[in-house]
C-alpha cells in the first residue's frame, strides 16, 4: 500500500475524463480509465486497450485492433460490461457533440477525422435536449457522418481528412478515450454524466476510486479485473490532500505518508 500527499489546490474537478482539460484531473483519472495507446517513460507508444495498430496508406486510414479481455467495472470491481470498439465511438460522439461536452477537447478530432466538424456543427443546430439524446449506435447520424468504422466489436478504423502519419499519438489523448453507452444509460442519460462521481462511474483502468472525500482523501484500489495482469500495482493508493508542503513534511515525519 502507498500513501502520499497532494496539495489541496490540485483537487479533482470532474470525473468525466472526456470533459476535463486539467492536469490535476488527468493525474487521477488516467489511473481509472485506459485509452487505446499509452506512452512509456521514454515517450514511445505502447499498447493499452489497442493491442495492434497501424496505417497502410500513409496515415489517411488508421486501424486499431482491440483486446477482447477489457472489462468495465463498478467502484467495487464488479463487472459491468465488455469494453469494445463501440465505446470509442460513444466517446468520440460525446467529444464532438456541442451540447454534451461544451467544446472541450474538440479541436483535434474536428481537425483530423473526416466528418467530425460536420457532425459538431450539426449538433450546434439542435436544442440541448435534442443533442443530448444522440448516440453513436449502429445506423446513427454520428456513424453515418463521421469517419469511424467498426467492422466488429474489437476493430476500430478512423478515416482522416488528410494523411496524418502521427495520428496514433493522438490515440493517447482524452479526445479519443472510451465511454460506455451502458454507463450513460444507467446514469439516466447525458445530463447526469457531467456530474457523475466515483461511486457511479464505470472503470476500465488499473484502479477504481473506492473512497473520495473532497479536499481530504482519495483511495485508489487495484481493479481485480484489470486486463494487464503483469502490471505491478499497489493494492491501494491513498492520496491525502494537504494545505501546504509544510503540512506534508509533518505528515511524513509522523509516518502518516510514505513520501
Name each model-derived stretch.
Residues 1-11, 61-64, 88-91, 156-157, ...:
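Short, well-ordered beta-strand elements
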Residues 7-57, 202-203:
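N-terminal lobe/hinge region of extracytoplasmic solute-binding protein
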Residues 34, 68-79, 144-146, 237-238:
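Second-shell loop/turn segments in exported
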Residues 37, 41, 68-71, 93-101, ...:
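Sec-exported extracytoplasmic/periplasmic mature domains
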Residues 41, 129-136, 141-145, 152-154, ...:
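Gly/Pro-rich hinge or "lid" segments in bacterial periplasmic/extracellular proteins
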Residues 52-115, 157, 248-253:
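Aromatic- and charge-enriched surface segment that lines or borders ligand/interaction sites
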Residues 57-58, 150-152:
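Residue-level recognition of beta-strand termini and adjacent short loop/turns
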Residues 239-250:
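Short helix-initiation/N-cap motifs at beta->coil->alpha
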Amino acid at each position: 500500500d502507498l500513501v502520499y500527499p497532494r496539495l489541496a489546490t490540485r483537487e479533482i474537478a470532474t470525473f468525466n475524463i472526456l470533459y476535463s482539460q486539467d492536469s490535476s484531473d488527468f493525474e487521477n483519472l488516467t489511473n481509472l480509465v485506459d485509452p487505446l495507446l499509452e506512452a512509456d517513460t521514454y515517450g514511445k507508444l505502447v499498447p493499452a486497450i489497442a493491442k495492434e495498430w497501424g496505417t497502410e496508406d500513409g496515415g489517411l486510414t488508421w486501424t486499431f485492433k482491440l483486446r477482447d479481455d477489457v472489462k468495465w467495472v463498478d467502484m467495487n470491481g464488479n463487472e459491468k460490461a465488455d469494453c469494445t470498439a463501440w465505446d470509442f465511438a460513444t466517446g468520440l460522439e460525446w467529444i464532438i457533440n456541442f451540447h454534451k461536452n461544451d467544446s472541450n477537447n474538440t479541436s483535434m478530432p474536428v481537425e483530423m477525422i473526416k466528418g467530425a466538424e460536420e457532425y459538431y456543427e450539426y449538433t450546434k443546430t439542435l436544442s440541448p435536449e435534442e443533442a443530448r439524446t444522440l448516440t453513436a449506435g449502429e445506423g446513427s447520424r454520428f456513424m453515418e457522418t463521421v469517419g469511424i468504422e467498426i467492422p466488429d466489436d474489437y476493430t476500430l478504423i478512423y478515416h482522416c481528412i488528410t494523411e496524418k502519419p502521427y495520428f496514433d499519438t493522438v490515440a493517447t489523448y482524452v479526445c479519443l478515450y472510451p465511454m460506455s453507452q451502458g454507463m450513460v444509460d444507467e446514469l439516466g442519460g447525458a445530463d447526469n454524466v457531467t456530474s457523475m462521481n466515483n461511486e457511479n462511474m464505470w472503470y476500465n483502468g488499473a484502479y477504481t476510486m473506492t473512497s473520495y472525500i473532497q479536499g481530504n482523501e482519495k483511495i485508489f484500489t487495484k481493479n481485480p479485473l484489470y486486463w494487464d495482469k503483469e502490471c505491478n500495482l499497489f493494492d491501494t493508493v491513498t492520496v491525502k490532500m494537504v494545505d501546504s508542503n509544510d503540512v506534508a513534511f509533518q505528515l511524513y515525519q509522523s509516518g502518516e505518508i510514505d513520501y
